[in-house]
Amino acid sequence: MYHYEIAVTAQSVILGFACARLLHATPHLFLKLCDLKIYLVWYVLCLHILIAFWTTINITKLADYDFLDFVLLMIYSGVSFIMCDSVFPSNSDKIISWEKHYFTINKTFWVCNIICALTLIIDIEKSRHIALGEDYYILYFIGIFPWIIYSLIAYFYQKSKVQWIVLILLTLNYSFHALSTFLNQEAKF
């Protein structure tokens, strides 16, 4: 078994648990009339997991995949699971007000987003820039920096209107990256 096959398997298990959290909460989320913010978070997390799975294909393009690459991948996957678990816990059926729940856990959600983005920056600079090509720095300006800025704004400004705006921007950002990944049919994020 190649080293990247082990990494893909480990990431698949962790992201599979994150996906299970989303799927477990889905009926409770859609059978109740919930705040639209929680639907946006659900959509963003679905795209986050899909893009994370797809970009793992780039591991096969790395010539010198090492332990640090593996650790960064596990941190990214683990934080993604924490993000899904905080928003959609195992007791999702007992959540009475999704809006109250969102405002209870949203700081955890935004910190997890920041950690994922910073981990991705380290990973890109360490080794993935080889797989991404010479124009990889564009990814920072259209994807990662807006992601960090949105997350910082939402973390520090807890007003409902600010949360709305940031979640809409984050949803558009993720939708754009998912669409561009789909159109390119190559893992670029």
What is each stretch, according to the model?
Residues 74-143:
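Membrane-proximal helix-loop-helix units in multi-pass membrane proteins
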Residues 27-40, 61-65, 91-103, 154-166:
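Membrane-interface helix-boundary motifs at transmembrane edges
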Residues 41-47, 162-175:
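Central hydrophobic cores of alpha-helical transmembrane segments
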Residues 5-6, 62-79:
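Alpha-helical transmembrane segments
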Residues 37-60:
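A generic, lipid-embedded transmembrane alpha helix
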Residues 1-18, 185:
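Hydrophobic transmembrane alpha-helical segments in integral membrane proteins
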Residues 10-21, 74-87, 143-153:
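Hydrophobic cores of alpha-helical transmembrane segments in multi-pass inner/ER membrane proteins
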Residues 127-128, 176-189:
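Juxtamembrane boundary at the C-terminal end of a transmembrane helix
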